[in-house]
Amino acid sequence: MRLLGAHRAALLVLACVVVVVIHGLGEAEALGGGGGFVRAQGTRFVLDGNPYYANGFNAYWLMLLAADPSQRGKVSAALGEAAGHGLTVARTWAFSDGGGGNALQLSPGNYNENTFKGLDFVLSEARKYGIKVILSLVDNYDSFGGRKQYVNWARAQGQGIGSDDEFFTNPVVKGFYKNHVKTVLTRKNTITGVAYRDDPTILAWELMNEPRCQSDLSGRTVQSWITEMAAHVKSIDRNHMLEVGLEGFYGASSPSRIAAVNPSGYQLGTDFIANNQVPGIDFATVHSYPDQWLSGKDDQAQLGFMGRWLDAHIADAQAVLRKPLLIAEFGKSWKDPGYSSGQRDALYGTVYAKIYESARRGGATVGGLFWQLLVPGMDSYRDGYEVVFGETPSTTGVITTNSRRLRFLSKAFARARQAQPARGKGRHNGGK
């Protein structure tokens, strides 16, 4: 009887939350924003008037493999398997800078059309499987060129640049980046015929994967860059949401959070609060890798940190930013000393529980993307964090359970919305 009572109480709470959320969705609908594009409305994602949860995965490699037609089957397999497990969002790169391999941008403004066609294929296949895509526009790191490559291009044109951090301030470098943004956003897909900026398959643009600027820990340099580039993106594309690509480290705007929440030594020139308050930034992101940030700590300490890290960001997204929060990267490596699949499952379970509880209460957390999804035959891409569904049954079960719970919430909100009378219409003039 106690369990039954608890179940009834939970349903009552959910019903109350549904009423509150549906009221907000009526306001969202009044503002427009259908047509298959996901919008940020308050602290929620909304798709055609209903709450939308970004339940998904990272697969940075999608464009790189799709650039080779003989490898496209792996892209299709990954998207198909993801959809089969209830995943709805993929995050991937729309960059690869420099002259090596399947680079996208060979030099400033000079693009490899075969690689661009690979990205066309990714978006076409994602649409086929009902998966939305977040496209990141440049990397902080140099594995795929990133800001170091941009700086080197500027040096080759005679710019006297000292540090790679001048990526954020040098006018020539910023011009290169703005040109790349415009090229990607205005690209017309050779398969679908739809310009990227008009394609609802794209969930959002990301300014940079994990921006950092250790030469200016005040955060002012990155803040200025975000402000300029957010305005640039929005001047080209008003259809899609935009996010920064932040890991979530707190900065000067919230000094108490630096000591209480940031892992020790992780103040890297970004500011979770200030950066996400920039006009044009539609939602906040956070990444979390306790096994890297707290290496040497035991599993319980890492799980405890994960809980505190997420709680702080969820609370701040709700009360301070008043914007949606996406947990855009999280994972645990099998290369960690003493690793067991149970440890990974516990970490995934912690993340998913935080997402579900926030979503169930109508809170700011709109989903999570694990790092990373692979399919068989991709051994060279294994980094320790990979999930291959057929090889990891327990973790796959955790992922699938989360998909099922979020799908239940989506359906509950959708049913409640359908049961609501049309806003602004009387009883007798709403049709049959």
Curated annotation (Swiss-Prot):
EC number: 3.2.1.78
Organism taxonomic ancestry: Eukaryota, Viridiplantae, Streptophyta, Embryophyta, Tracheophyta
Protein name, entry field: Mannan endo-1,4-beta-mannosidase 1
Catalytic activity: Random hydrolysis of (1->4)-beta-D-mannosidic linkages in mannans, galactomannans and glucomannans
GO CC annotations, alphabetized: extracellular region
Family of the protein in this entry: Belongs to the glycosyl hydrolase 5 (cellulase A) family.
Active site per database record: E210, E329
Cited Gene3D superfamilies: Glycosidases
Entry binding sites for substrate: W93, N209, Y289, W371
Keyword Signal: yes
Swiss-Prot/TrEMBL GO biological process terms: polysaccharide catabolic process
Gene from which this protein is expressed: MAN1
Organism: Oryza sativa subsp. japonica (Rice)
One annotated GO molecular function: mannan endo-1,4-beta-mannosidase activity
Annotated tissue distribution: Ubiquitous.
Signal peptide: 1-28
Compartments where located: Secreted
Keywords in alphabetical order: Glycosidase, Hydrolase, Secreted, Signal
